[in-house]
């Protein structure tokens, strides 16, 4: 056929090239997925970013899957992004109520930090020495979404019929600052953040009440938005970070930045580790569910 129609083969190749060109162009233009990661604002926005940015940069490089930090001005703002399904990965304990369970989030890890306890505390030199003295007082909290820092201590106050006014600072450091500026008479928080602030800022607290133990916040992914292969890659990077000398160095520096007492790293976890959170909602006051 080529002998009878010189140049026919070249014509076919040219037509094939033209036909395939758009597909090849689209393939080369295709960008890898970028997943948004939203950790609860445990500190002010700058310190939260200082802690997490080096960690997620490492995880992105190690996994080959791009993560991007997405945090709001307050912890409530950040959780609003999550509830609006604007993110794919979180570090949170705000998603264990029955309504939020239905959103399709799944636990894959947590920090190896000691168990957290909710606490109600006053400044070390405060004249207040018992929780009953908080009746009619103002108590600072990070925000209404904070499970250990707000829902647990406020539920305890309600159970004791101690009528106090909640003042939301937007993040835990702001609530602590209000306490030591005399704008509130007590704070609700978790034990890790009280200990960390005490070390970092050289401040003394007097703890009036402590709850039972709860696991630290959970690393979670959206089962509706992230394919299994990307979950496995990101999970492996988080959970193996402390075994890599460079990863361990990043974790050490990040822990120092926020006043953590130890080099907290990430370990495997599952939804069953957070059963105590779900139990709370079975009997919690309606205003705290």
Language-model-detected regions and their locations in the chain:
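N-terminal secretory signal peptides that target proteins for export/translocation
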Residues: 1-7
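Bacterial N-terminal signal peptides
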Residues: 10-23
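An extracytoplasmic/periplasmic, membrane-proximal ligand-sensing/linker region
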Residues: 32-39, 43-54, 225-289
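Short loop->beta-strand "edge-of-pocket" segments that line small-molecule binding or catalytic clefts
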Residues: 33-43, 132-149
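Short helices/loops that flank or line small-molecule/ion binding pockets
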Residues: 76-89, 103, 132, 173-188, ...
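Hydrophobic/proline-rich hinge and linker segments of small-molecule sensing/allosteric domains
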Residues: 107-130, 218-222
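Pocket-lining segment of extracytoplasmic ligand-binding domains
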Residues: 126, 137-236
């Amino acid at each position: 056929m080529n002998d009878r129609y010189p140049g026919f083969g070249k014509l076919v190749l040219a037509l094939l090239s033209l036909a395939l060109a758009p597909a090849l162009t689209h393939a080369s233009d295709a960008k890898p997925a970028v997943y948004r990661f939203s950790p609860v604002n445990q500190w002010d926005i700058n310190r939260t970013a200082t802690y997490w940015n080096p960690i997620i940069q490492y995880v992105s490089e190690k996994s080959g899957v791009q993560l991007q930090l997405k945090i709001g001005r307050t912890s409530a703002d950040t959780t609003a992004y999550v509830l609006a399904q604007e993110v794919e990965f979180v570090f949170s304990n705000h998603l264990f109520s029955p309504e939020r369970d239905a959103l399709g989030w799944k636990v894959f890890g947590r920090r190896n930090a000691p168990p957290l306890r909710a606490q109600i505390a006053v400044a070390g030199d405060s004249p207040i020495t018992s929780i009953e003295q908080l009746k009619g007082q103002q108590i600072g909290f990070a925000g209404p979404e904070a499970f250990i820092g707000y829902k647990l201590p406020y539920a305890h106050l309600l159970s004791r019929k101690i009528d106090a006014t909640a003042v939301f600072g937007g993040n835990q450091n702001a609530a602590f600052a209000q306490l030591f500026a005399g704008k509130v008479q007590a704070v609700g928080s978790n034990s890790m953040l009280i200990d960390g602030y005490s070390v970092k800022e050289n401040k003394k607290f007097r703890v009036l009440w402590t709850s039972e133990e709860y696991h630290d916040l959970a690393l979670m992914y959206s089962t509706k938005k992230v394919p299994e292969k990307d979950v496995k890659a990101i999970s492996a990077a988080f959970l193996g970070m402390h075994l890599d000398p460079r990863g361990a160095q990043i974790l050490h520096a990040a822990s120092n930045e926020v006043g953590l007492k130890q080099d907290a790293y990430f370990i495997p976890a599952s939804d069953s580790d957070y059963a105590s959170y779900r139990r709370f909602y079975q009997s919690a006051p309606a205003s705290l569910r």
